[in-house]
Amino acid sequence: MGRAHTVSRGEDHPPIARSELPDDTAALARYLIGKLVVRDLPEGMVSGRIVETEAYVVGDAAGHGFRGMTPRNRSLFLERGHAYVYLAYGVSMMLNVSSEVPGIGTGVLIRALEPLDGIEIMRRNRGVERLRDLARGPGRLAAALRIDRSLDGLDLCRKGPLWLAKDNQKPGEIGQSTRIGITKDAARLLRFYVRGSLFVSGPRSLQE
């Protein structure tokens, strides 16, 4: 059985201090489970609880930083806690968090959120009603929060248009698996998720 869905009361969400973020990519991916992504939009605040992440570590052939820095991926090489936003397959934006010291191109992909604040705004952004489907998967998540390339390089440890925040609830049991849709370094157990959450993406076999 999954955890009961709980809606934030819209309280102020202070950003996470950078010093609290682990400086190891896999550790950061696990740490971010249960934390909040907060988006400040003209219509109001939107937020969600992180229920699924993937780590892309040093020497990882599946990572965007594997072959070095380029104009497209330079935000991945910033100090941990910055946004790396890119367009995947010409279709969907992807939100990542840079994860180590400056110059090391590693990051954590935020794969899924449990919607909290601004659910009606998310529904309009996504054009769907079903709560479970608003931010279940990285492309849906980005659409629900209206993530675009203008946010690339943003410091997520400071309040602004987008930031990371703590939550006052424990996330539940955290599972670990191989990453989704990866063909290089595919055997690594670098995906983290809340077991039994209705808001986790991927096949059922990777949700338990």
Curated annotation (Swiss-Prot):
It comes from the Bacteria. Keywords: DNA damage, DNA repair, Hydrolase. One of its GO terms (molecular function) is DNA binding. One of its GO terms (biological process) is base-excision repair. InterPro entries: Formyl_transferase-like_C_sf (IPR011034), MPG (IPR003180), MPG_sf (IPR036995). Residues 1-20 are annotated as: Disordered. It holds the Pfam family Pur_DNA_glyco. Gene3D superfamilies: Methylpurine-DNA glycosylase (MPG). Disulfide bonds: none annotated. Coiled coil: none annotated. Its EC number is 3.2.2.-. Belongs to the DNA glycosylase MPG family. This is Putative 3-methyladenine DNA glycosylase. The lineage of its organism: Bacteria, Pseudomonadati, Pseudomonadota, Alphaproteobacteria, Hyphomicrobiales.
